């Protein structure tokens, strides 16, 4: 796995024990590490990456929850082959509690589904954003890692959610349209005084070398016009078997763990595990709810 991080690092069992907190039903001040996945356009494979990396982190012994914030076009539940009874819609409407919308999937990670085909969720007002902030804090108190699947594009709720994460994973691919739209999101993030580190994953690439070259193009533009350095997380080559898969099949890391795509996904999960460890050893002063409320006031 090519990365700007130390390629020789691997999680030791002792370090993993440091990552794990007290049991989920115990009180603890330290909250989950928040990693938000964004993209400039749909179709980059953002949800595919989010769900498979959640499984990869779970396989490493971490307690993981996926929060599908792609409201109205949510599909994380499909990729995790889950049929949740309730979604974030029910929570934001005050109909259900966080416990009722939280679902345990068959593959390990927990899930809060986003709700699909619901236009009222496409643009949340300040009140509902505040409710979302409180929900994220409740989840962050129970898990080690919180993965947020944000809607593609520049919608305010997506930008706010990206800005409250400890790390942003920007998902793109070698297509010009995907790179152009990814840069638009990055440029918008660059205008904010307080912003997370931005990691880039080049998905659906013919080779890892093409993935690296694609990143360098995006990084060069970002440095020149947005004065924002980007970090290369890695590339995910598209194995020939991927394009023939159906939604009814198990996630890639479970169904085909030895294929080239899964090998790349596993490597990325290892890097996210490292991010989680580093954040847990140097926690910030504000919880995720406070960070989001501050962004809502600024936006």
Q: Which residues does each PLM region occupy?
A:
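NTP-binding/hydrolysis catalytic cores, primarily Walker-type P-loop NTPases
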Residues: 252-299
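Conserved C-terminal guanine-recognition region of P-loop GTPase G domains, centered on the G4
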Residues: 179-194
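Inter-motif core of Ras-like GTPase G domains
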Residues: 138-142, 155-177
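G-domain G4 guanine-recognition motif of GTPases
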Residues: 40, 173-174, 198-213, 235-242, ...
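Walker A/P-loop NTP-binding active-site region of P-loop NTPases
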Residues: 34-98, 147
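P-loop/Walker-type NTP enzyme "switch/lid" segment
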Residues: 69-141, 244-251
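Extreme N-terminal, non-catalytic leader segments
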Residues: 1-43, 62, 100
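Beta-strand-loop-alpha "switch" segments that mediate conformational coupling across diverse proteins
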Residues: 226-253, 265
């Amino acid at each position: 796995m090519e990365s700007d991080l130390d390629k020789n690092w691997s999680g030791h069992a002792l370090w993993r024990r440091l990552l794990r907190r007290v049991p989920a039903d115990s009180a603890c001040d330290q909250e989950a590490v928040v990693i938000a996945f964004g993209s400039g356009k749909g179709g980059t494979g953002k949800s595919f990456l989010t769900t498979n990396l959640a499984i990869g982190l779970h396989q490493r012994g971490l307690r993981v929850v996926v929060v599908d914030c792609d409201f109205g076009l949510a599909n994380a539940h499909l990729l995790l082959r889950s049929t949740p009874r309730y979604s974030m819609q029910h929570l934001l409407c005050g109909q259900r509690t966080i416990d009722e919308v939280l679902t345990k999937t068959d593959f390990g990670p927990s899930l809060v589904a986003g709700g699909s085909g619901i236009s009222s969720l496409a643009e949340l007002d300040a009140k509902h954003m505040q409710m979302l902030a409180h929900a994220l804090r409740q989840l962050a108190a129970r898990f080690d890692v919180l993965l947020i699947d944000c809607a593609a594009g520049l919608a305010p709720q997506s930008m706010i959610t990206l800005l409250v994460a400890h790390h942003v994973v920007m998902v793109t691919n070698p297509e010009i349209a995907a790179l152009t739209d990814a840069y638009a999101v990055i440029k918008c993030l660059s205008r904010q005084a307080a912003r997370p580190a931005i990691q880039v994953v080049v998905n659906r690439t013919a080779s890892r070398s093409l993935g690296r070259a694609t990143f360098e193009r995006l990084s060069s533009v970002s440095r020149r016009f947005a004065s924002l350095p980007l970090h290369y997380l890695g590339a995910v080559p598209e194995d020939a078997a991927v394009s023939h898969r159906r939604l009814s099949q198990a996630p890639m890391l479970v169904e085909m763990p030895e294929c080239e795509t899964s090998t790349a996904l596993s490597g990325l999960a290892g890097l996210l595990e490292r991010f989680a460890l580093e954040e847990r050893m140097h926690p910030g002063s504000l919880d995720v709810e406070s960070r989001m409320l501050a962004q809502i006031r600024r936006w």
